[in-house]
UniProtKB/Swiss-Prot annotation:
Pfam families: SMC_ScpB. Belongs to the ScpB family. Gene3D superfamilies: Winged helix-like DNA-binding domain superfamily/Winged helix DNA-binding domain. Homodimer. Homodimerization may be required to stabilize the binding of ScpA to the Smc head domains. Component of a cohesin-like complex composed of ScpA, ScpB and the Smc homodimer, in which ScpA and ScpB bind to the head domain of Smc. The presence of the three proteins is required for the association of the complex with DNA. This is Segregation and condensation protein B. It comes from Lactococcus lactis subsp. lactis (strain IL1403).
Amino acid sequence: MNKTASCELLLFVSGEAGLTLAELSALTEMSKQACQQQIDYLKEKYHSDEESALTIIETAGKYRMATKEEFAEILKNYAKTPLNQSLSKSALEVLSIIAYKQPLTRLEIDHLRGVNSSGVLSTLRAFDLVEKVGQVEAPGRPSLYATTDFFLDYIGINHLDELPEIDESRFIAEEQTLFNESEENENQ
């Protein structure tokens, strides 16, 4: 079995966790010195190959495959684009709230939704649809959230003024009807 390919395979499948020289040595049944030679060879091979986007890096004593720095912008764009991933209903709900009422704090979002929105906000920030835009001058200095320019691109508009109008009075009336029905059912 090819020693170089074995090291390359193991670095590939280890992903972001990476492998120490000792782990690589144990898995390939090669000496640490032989593994180091294979890693050095692969580093040079990737470095000199302009057709390859890969490199091998060492972080905290672990080796792992990574992409070359010059491809960072492409990866950043890929990470921003949901592609085959779709936003959950709760993420769409929070995104809508922020789009129409921005800027606002997580607590304001939680109050409107009736549930904690921390996880959803993290997801929306990871997709670069929402960002922190400041802090409220109040105890705890809570962060204010607003949509990003990427959000506008994502939904295909140029400015927030292009968002469809919503009739809040209709939603309030519907909520009141549901609340009244719930009370009537409890009293029966």
